């Protein structure tokens, strides 16, 4: 034992010393594994049992089997009682213990004769063993195929013998020998010879198994003058000779085949020619097969069409019969009409092409709208609907220009939860801005034509808005100008009657003429754009020009409005002076004359009117602070008018806005 084992197992050192194999003399063995070699090499001490010990320790009737593991047990089955019996106990069994023979009398001479033959057979087993072994050895020298055939023949012969023996035994023939088969088997399975069973069940000796080793088949090497190196491998074999296989030999490498001398062309060229020749044959055969397959397919299709035609005819006949039977009884008639309609639908069903099927499937997929059964809720439905209603209420409350859509969904839709079919997955609703209404249908127009129409509509909308603004401004200008004319005519009493109103009317007339001209130009441009079709850049340039014209119009209108305000202020100041009674007629005349000269100068912008920027009669009347500071600056070069109007002052030194 090792010290490591002692430490692991916890054995005391005294016990190890007492029971150790070495006992302190010599080196100790590591373990029992070191004794395996000596145990295998030592032969068996007892090959057989001693007869004296058997007689001494066992009964005389006892039978012991020597070496039962190394040698097979030899036994036979009794045909009368079906019990397995050893070869040495068959006679005793038949004489004393066989149940099948107990019913018969022991004095039968036939039974005695059979027992004698069995004894003779058992005694002769030892003599026949050697003969059988020799015969088996001679038979086993043949090839594998011959051995199998011989074994099968032997089995057939044995079966025939068994049948004949059984028949003779049934007839109580004295020549019957039930141990004929057993003796042959016993000879094959003698204890002194190593045996082995074949696949067929027949025993074979150890010597025959050694001789039955399979040999590797090799091609017979041929001589050099018998080989065509242009068609055969031609590699030298180690046994001598050359390989006579074809150029596609798999047992030799490509390098060895290329190194062979004696070829008219290189090996690769010869191999390509070889493949070409064989592939042509293969290609012709493949073409024939393809033609045959096509013919078979056509025949199958014709057969299928014929079957369909026959089925349709049968269905039509059945439907006619059902219609005839349906006229006899009302119930059967109703059923037959239903079946008839189904059959007609089945017969008249249109077969769709694969393209139509794909289009239908794609249409179905595009129109499908799967909705989830459950989704995340960011806010409650109540708050969401309230927010949506309030938003739509505000959107629908504001006024929208004519020709544009309303931003909201409407009075009814704002009260319920709307669903935008264009964007169903959006959690929030889009804010809809007012958009122009398309009165005309744009179904048969190109995208470029649609873009042009939209641009033209935008220009028309701008022009309409400009015209409306101009009309409103003109209405506002007419009312103050009429009042100013009436007020000026009363105090002047015929003095220079045509200067002031003439200037005002001329300015308004000029403004109206200019606006009309601009409108005409815009209309002409619109007609031209509709006829020719302008590009987006040209349309933008036209829009810029229109904006510049609008700015100029606004400037002229602003100047006219300033003049109207100045006249109003002057009238108010004159009324205040008449009420107070402190003004003189001369001063009023001078003031009126100054105003008339000022307006006349304004009506003719080319004249220089620097002297009338602040007349003393207007700014200060009789040295008092009552007056109006107009602050009109006119530049003679450009003809631009800058009007600066101050605040009027009442007699109590208070400003009038």
From Swiss-Prot:
Instruction: Look up and give the organism this protein is from.
Output: Saccharomyces cerevisiae (strain ATCC 204508 / S288c)
Bias (Basic and acidic residues) occurs at: 107-118
Keyword field contains Nucleus: yes
- Composition bias (Basic residues) maps to 306-321
Protein name per the record: SAGA complex subunit SGF73
Ranges of Acidic residues composition bias in the record: 131-163
What further fact does the record state? Present with 486 molecules/cell in log phase SD medium.
What is the recorded function of this protein according to its Swiss-Prot or TrEMBL entry?
Answer: Component of the transcription coactivator SAGA complex. SAGA acts as a general cofactor required for essentially all RNA polymerase II transcription. At the promoters, SAGA is required for transcription pre-initiation complex (PIC) recruitment. It influences RNA polymerase II transcriptional activity through different activities such as TBP interaction (via core/TAF module) and promoter selectivity, interaction with transcription activators (via Tra1/SPT module), and chromatin modification through histone acetylation (via HAT module) and deubiquitination (via DUB module).
Q: Which Pfam families match?
A: SCA7, zf_C2H2_13
Where is it mostly found?
nucleus
Keywords attached to this entry: Cytoplasm, Nucleus, Transcription, Transcription regulation
Chain positions covered by the region annotation Disordered: 98-225, 287-353, 469-532, 572-636
Q: Where does Zn(2+) bind?
A: 78, 81, 93, 98
Q: Which GO terms describe its molecular function?
A: enzyme activator activity; structural molecule activity
- Which GO CC annotations does the UniProt entry carry? cytosol; DUBm complex; nucleus; SAGA complex; SLIK (SAGA-like) complex
Sequence similarity: Belongs to the ataxin-7 family.
Q: Where in the cell is it found?
A: Nucleus; Cytoplasm
Positions with biased composition (Low complexity): 325-336, 469-493, 517-526, 584-594
Kindly give the Gene3D superfamilies that the UniProt entry links to this protein. 6.10.140.670, Classic Zinc Finger
Compositionally biased intervals (Polar residues): 174-193, 200-210, 504-516, 572-583, 600-636
Assembly: Component of the 1.8 MDa SAGA (Spt-Ada-Gcn5 acetyltransferase) complex, which is composed of 19 subunits TRA1, SPT7, TAF5, NGG1/ADA3, SGF73, SPT20/ADA5, SPT8, TAF12, TAF6, HFI1/ADA1, UBP8, GCN5, ADA2, SPT3, SGF29, TAF10, TAF9, SGF11 and SUS1.
The protein's superkingdom reads Eukaryota
| One of the GO biological process terms | RITS complex assembly
Task: Name all SCA7 domain ranges.
Answer: 220-286
Record InterPro entries: SCA7_dom, SGF73, Znf_C2H2_13
On whether Cytoplasm is a keyword of this UniProt record, the answer is yes
